[in-house]
Amino acid sequence: MSLEDDVKSIIVEQLGVDPSEVTENSSFIEDLNADSLDLTELIMTLEEKFNFEISEQDAEKLRTVGDVLAYIKTRQGQ
């Protein structure tokens, strides 16, 4: 499974959205109707899955699916 598929699967499961709604440009709040609790749970799940901590400062910048993918790729490249 690719990184994109992994992240999409987590988002679908955490937010209860249809997989077809999850694209790189999807905004968690505007497009996927996530609230702050949803986003906190999503960040925690991503941290657990990818085995690194996402700072509160970084988490606030993760507004779209593409933002999350780019962030994970950067962190994995370290």
From Swiss-Prot:
- GO process terms (BP): lipid A biosynthetic process
Pathway where it operates = Lipid metabolism; fatty acid biosynthesis
**Which positions does the record annotate as the modified residue O-(pantetheine 4'-phosphoryl)serine?**
S36
Q: Does the entry feature the keyword Transmembrane, yes or no?
A: no
The protein's matches in InterPro entries, at most eight in alphabetical order, are given as:
ACP, ACP-like_sf, PP-bd_ACP, Ppantetheine_attach_site
Its post-translational modification remark reads: 4'-phosphopantetheine is transferred from CoA to a specific serine of apo-ACP by AcpS. This modification is essential for activity because fatty acids are bound in thioester linkage to the sulfhydryl of the prosthetic group.
Q: What is its main location?
A: cytoplasm
Key words of the record? Cytoplasm, Fatty acid biosynthesis, Fatty acid metabolism, Lipid biosynthesis, Lipid metabolism, Phosphopantetheine, Phosphoprotein
Q: Which NCBIfam families match?
A: acyl_carrier (TIGR00517), PRK00982.1-2 (NF002148), PRK00982.1-4 (NF002150), PRK00982.1-5 (NF002151)
Q: Which family does it belong to?
A: Belongs to the acyl carrier protein (ACP) family.
UniProt cross-references to PANTHER family, sorted A to Z: ACYL CARRIER PROTEIN, CARRIER DOMAIN-CONTAINING PROTEIN
Protein name (database record): Acyl carrier protein
> Source species, please?
Chlamydia abortus (strain DSM 27085 / S26/3) (Chlamydophila abortus)
Q: What gene codes for this chain? A: acpP
